[in-house]
Each structure stands twice: as structure tokens, then as C-alpha cells.
UniProtKB/Swiss-Prot annotation:
GO terms for biological process, alphabetical: alkaloid metabolic process; methylation
Residue sites binding S-adenosyl-L-methionine per the record: V55, E77, G79, V80, S85, D103, A132, D157
Catalytic activity, EC: 2.1.1.336
Tissue expression per record: Mostly expressed in bulbs, and, to a lower extent, in stems and roots.
Homology family: Belongs to the class I-like SAM-binding methyltransferase superfamily. Cation-dependent O-methyltransferase family.
A GO molecular-function annotation: O-methyltransferase activity
Name of protein: Norbelladine 4'-O-methyltransferase
Binding annotation for a divalent metal cation: D155, D181, N182
Pathway, per record: Alkaloid biosynthesis
InterPro entries: Cation-dep_OMT, SAM-dependent_MTases_sf, SAM_O-MeTrfase
Organism: Narcissus pseudonarcissus (Daffodil)
Cofactor: Mg(2+)
Gene3D superfamilies assigned to the protein according to its UniProt record, in alphabetical order: Vaccinia Virus protein VP39 (3.40.50.150)
Amino acid sequence: MGASQDDYSLVHKNILHSEDLLKYILETSAYPREHEQLKGLREVTEKHEWSSALVPADEGLFLSMLLKLMNAKRTIEIGVYTGYSLLTTALALPEDGKITAIDVNKSFFEIGLPFIQKAGVEHKINFIESEALPVLDQMLQEMKEEDLYDYAFVDADKSNYANYHERLVKLVRIGGAILYDNTLWYGSVAYPEYPGLYPEDEVDRLSFRNLNTFLAADPRVEISQVSIGDGVTICRRLY
């Protein structure tokens, strides 16, 4: 069974389709707690033509809380864009925390760099301009037990999430967390068919349906799929 025509009109970045409730959450809980430099970066990014790729402020607070609860120190980020989630992570890590951030386009990262610098956390970030898979493969070749990561956040090319997972489940320590963004894909993953999407969005939608089924059956991790932003799946490595 496909979606109804009314469902199609609801496609947007956040799966919370009540605009009033979303506005309430952001204005009551998220924006008052948003770091000054994150606010500045968000406002600049919202004017960008690819602003839909911005991690929402309420999701950013969720990521920050998780990082602090985990006492994470070493993290990986695949897909940086202007760096909202990257700056969120850097602010949440301790002073000696380290982030390996990978993206194919450094020009987007440079939009956020002044805000990262003003926040005083640039020293925590190692930005690598590259496709992620070759970097991850090299990291696996050079990895020692003490070099394992606490946490990884993926918000990149959707069709490669499964490939990233196979690497990250070895790079992140047992008990560590791997997070995948956008896994509910505007809510469209609920339907076997979803007419009206752009062809590239339909490819990503099908990729997420396959990924969600795969992660739910992967014995190496336990998962929780959270309906915040556009959907975030948290994987905790078991072995």
C-alpha cells in the first residue's frame, strides 16, 4: 500500500509534521539552550541553498547529551556540511577530546570554521577532505586497540551507510555508539512505494528501508531508532 496524496504534502526535513509543536519544542527547549556559536552557524546555514542538510537544534542537543553521558573522547564524523553537528560534538567533548571529521567538500566546512574558532574548539578537530571509505579503510589498517573510537556520527551519502557500518563497527569500541542520521527520510520509509519524490530521493529512501531492516537484524549491535529531526538510529556495539 502506498501513501495517500495528503501524505505527500507532508514531506519536509523534520518528521514532526505538526509545525506548531515543532516550533514549540525549538523555542521552548532547544533555542534557549543553544550555544551562541551554534546559533550563529545555524542562522548562516539557514540562508544557504542546501540548508535542508542542517542538523536541527533539538537534534543537536540530543547528540550533545548522549556524548556527555557516554563520556566520549574520540569520535568520527562522516559528512560535515557547514559543521553544526561537528561543532556540537566539539563543544560536548572534554578539552583533550578529538574528532576525525571527513567530508568531500571543504568549502562547506569553511563556512562553519569561524564559529568553531570563536568557540575555541578548533584544536579538537582533524578535518579530512576525502571520500570516507578510503579513509576508513586506512584507519582500519593502522588501528590499534587503544585507538578505537567512542562514537561515530554519519550524515553523508545515504547509499553508502551500509558500507560505512561495516567499517565503523570495527573502528568503534565495544559499548561505543554509531549514529546514522536521516533514517526515517521524511517519514517516507513507512511506505513500500512513495510516488512524487525526486529520483535521487527515491534511491535514498529505498537505501534507508534496506538499512533499517539490516540494522534491526545485525547481532553486532543493539539499536534504538529515534524520531527526532529526520530520524536518528543509535547503534551500540556489542562485540
